[in-house]
Swiss-Prot record:
It comes from the Eukaryota. This is M-ectatotoxin-Eb2a. Expressed by the venom gland. It is found in: Secreted. One of its GO terms (biological process) is defense response to bacterium. The keyword Secreted applies. One of its GO terms (cellular component) is extracellular region. It comes from Ectatomma brunneum. The keyword Secreted applies. The lineage of its organism: Eukaryota, Metazoa, Ecdysozoa, Arthropoda, Hexapoda. Keywords: Antibiotic, Antimicrobial, Cytolysis, Hemolysis, Secreted. Disulfide bonds: none annotated. Antimicrobial peptide forming an alpha-helix in watery and membraneous environments, enabling it to perforate membranes. Active against Gram-negative bacteria E.coli DH5alpha (MIC=5 uM), E.coli MH1 (MIC=0.6 uM) and P.aeruginosa PAO1 (MIC=10 uM) and against Gram-positive bacteria B.subtilis VKM B-501 (MIC=0.6 uM) and A.globiformis VKM Ac-1112 (MIC=0.2 uM). Has cytolytic and hemolytic activity.
Length: 27
């Protein structure tokens, strides 16, 4: 499940400003 989700996120997230910062806060 997470494998498929991560593939989608890896394609979409780089195009969304502030995503990296958000992920760093979550982790």
């Amino acid at each position: 499940f997470w494998g498929a989700v991560w593939k989608i996120l890896s394609k979409v997230l780089p195009h969304i400003p502030g995503t990296v910062k958000w992920l760093q806060e979550k982790v």
